Amino acid sequence: MDPKSPEFIIDQPLKILGFVFDELSATRVSGHLTLTEKCCQPFKVLHGGVSALIAEALASLGAGIASGFKRVAGIHLSIHHLRPAALGEIVFAESFPVSVGKNIQVWEVRLWKAKKTETPDNKIMVSTSRVTLFCGLPIPDHVKDAPDELKKVISKL
């Protein structure tokens, strides 16, 4: 993984864990992660802190896009851990806006894994989250190019 690539730049902690973005837009951010030991607790299941990291990262990216590529900051995260996901399983994640205002946005984030059998509803919910974000913050000079890098990544998905 090239640390200078635009895709790596958008969220280094998630990329280090192996998270792959599937969609980035103002109305939906999604991706997936194969669970390795890096993201599991000693009991070989997904660490709750990793679930929280995914939730805040996806909501922040979506809110940043929805705000016109302005800087955003998470001000509240509420997460419910519903079921475990084990080492080796693939966890899917999606985030979508609940409320998009000029200064405050609220995003819902869901993590799930696939059932082992084919059924009409093939999802086992792992966690659900709500993330509240403050939007429109100034972008510091040393990262002024961050919005352009994010736009490059979006154009490649």
Curated annotation (Swiss-Prot):
Can you tell which superkingdom this protein's organism belongs to? Eukaryota
Pathway per its UniProt entry is: Cofactor biosynthesis; phylloquinone biosynthesis; Quinol/quinone metabolism; 1,4-dihydroxy-2-naphthoate biosynthesis; 1,4-dihydroxy-2-naphthoate from chorismate: step 7/7
Report the sequence similarity comment from the record: Belongs to the 4-hydroxybenzoyl-CoA thioesterase family. DHNA-CoA hydrolase subfamily.
Q: What class of enzyme is it?
A: hydrolase
Species of origin: Arabidopsis thaliana (Mouse-ear cress)
Q: What does this protein do?
A: Catalyzes the hydrolysis of the thioester bond of 1,4-dihydroxy-2-naphthoyl-CoA (DHNA-CoA) in peroxisomes, a necessary step to form the naphthoquinone ring of phylloquinone (vitamin K(1)). Displayed also slight thioesterase activity towards benzoyl-CoA. Is not active on phenylacetyl-CoA, succinyl-CoA and palmitoyl-CoA thioesters.
Q: Does Hydrolase count among this protein's keywords?
A: yes
Q: Where is the active site?
A: E56
Q: What happens when the gene is disrupted?
A: Reduced DHNA-CoA thioesterase activity and phylloquinone content.
Instruction: Give the residue interval(s) assigned to the motif Microbody targeting signal.
Output: 154-156
Alphabetically ordered keywords of this record: Hydrolase, Peroxisome
Q: Where in the cell is it found?
A: Peroxisome
State any further remark. Answer: May originate from a horizontal gene transfer with a bacterial species of the Lactobacillales order.
Q: Name one GO cellular component term.
A: peroxisome
GO terms for biological process? phylloquinone biosynthetic process; protein homotetramerization
What Enzyme Commission number(s) apply to this enzyme?
A: 3.1.2.-
The protein's assembly and partners: Homotetramers.
Q: Which InterPro entries match?
A: HotDog_dom_sf, PAAI_dom, Thioestr_dom
Question: Listed GO molecular functions?
Answer: hydrolase activity
> What is the protein name given in its UniProt record?
1,4-dihydroxy-2-naphthoyl-CoA thioesterase 2
* Major location category of this protein: other
Lineage per the UniProt record: Eukaryota, Viridiplantae, Streptophyta, Embryophyta, Tracheophyta
